[in-house]
A protein has these predicted regions:
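C-terminal functional module detector
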Residues: 1-10, 30, 167-172, 177-293
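A metal-dependent hydrolase metal-coordination microenvironment
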Residues: 2-118, 124-135, 140-163, 174-176, ...
């Protein structure tokens, strides 16, 4: 089963950022220009509780704008922030800020959007809460602004997501900047969509089909599952690491400087496998969890 293939091409995307229409420091026009200058192909402006709609002549050539918003809740011991990607402007009227996060997920979907759980490590989200959600299209495995130098080291949510995956909630993984200040976090990460369809419909279709990976820079070029073997091809890596619901599996970390591929034989006890590629500079790329069995 082919999961990712370089033959389909990749689009470099950021699905989480803010402008002066909410709590960002740059105008929508300047934000879009900044991301296009960094070779991003698609951008979702996700201002809080509204859908920002820049004028057509403000959108740089070569950049596809995906409608978006961010809905937020503060619970007694954690926050919940939800991205609505591809959502219609009606979301501002059809969600209830005094309701529940699940109701917000339902509202995003009712308005044609895809709901993505943002920065769960930063938000202190529990396994129980994340497993309770229904209708999510994914989760941020990495969020740039939740890490240094703009925040504490809560940008990487990978370790806390494995218990969620192990309990059957297999969520596709995004990496987004969540840019606010534009003081270094812009361009720190990307979600790489495995499609050459640059339309809004094509981008949302790739999200629906899970054809993407999350990255701080390293490339994943091929990913497949065939006869119980996970195969990955990537840019030169220091480590290629295979994670699953099993706490002890031999040979799950491949440490060979400059390696560009690895194979992993799954065991009958494993319900999912995900892969992390770590480059020599310490930056990572992550696949989504692959369902087994």
């Amino acid at each position: 089963m082919e999961l990712l293939s370089a033959s389909r091409g990749f689009l470099k995307c950021n699905f989480h950022c803010h402008t002066t229409c909410s709590d960002g420091r740059l105008s929508p026009k300047d934000v879009m220009a900044a991301y296009r200058a960094l070779d991003y192909d698609a951008l979702a402006i996700t201002d809080h509780r509204e859908v920002t709609r820049p004028a057509a002549d403000e959108i740089p050539a070569g950049l596809m704008r995906i409608p978006g918003t961010e809905l937020d809740f503060l619970l007694p011991t954690q926050a919940v922030h939800l991205l609505g990607l591809g959502v219609s402007p009606d979301i501002a009227d059809c969600w209830n800020p005094n309701g529940t996060p699940q109701q917000a997920i339902d509202s995003i979907r009712a308005c044609g959007g895809r709901a993505v759980l943002a920065h769960p490590a930063w938000s202190l989200n529990t396994t129980e809460l994340m497993c309770s959600f229904r209708g999510l299209s994914g989760v941020e495995i990495f969020n740039s602004v939740s890490s240094v130098p703009t925040n504490a080291l809560r940008g990487d949510s990978a370790a806390m997501l494995d218990p969620v995956f192990a309990n059957g909630q297999l969520l596709n993984c995004f990496a987004n900047d969540d840019s606010h200040r534009y003081e270094g976090e812009c361009g720190m990460s990307a979600t790489m969509l495995n499609t050459n369809d640059r339309s809004v419909a094509g981008i949302l279709r790739a999200i629906d089909e899970g054809r993407f990976y999350a990255t701080q820079g390293p490339e994943i070029r091929e990913l497949s599952l065939t006869d119980g073997v996970v195969h990955i091809a990537c840019s030169p890596a220091k480590y290629i690491i295979f994670y699953s619901n099993e706490v002890w599996i031999p040979n799950r970390t491949r440490a060979l400087e400059g390696q560009t591929s690895a194979d992993y034989v799954v065991s009958p006890r494993e319900s999912f496998v995900r892969v992390q590629v770590v480059a020599e500079d310490g930056k990572s790329a992550w696949t989504s969890p692959i369902k087994l069995g």
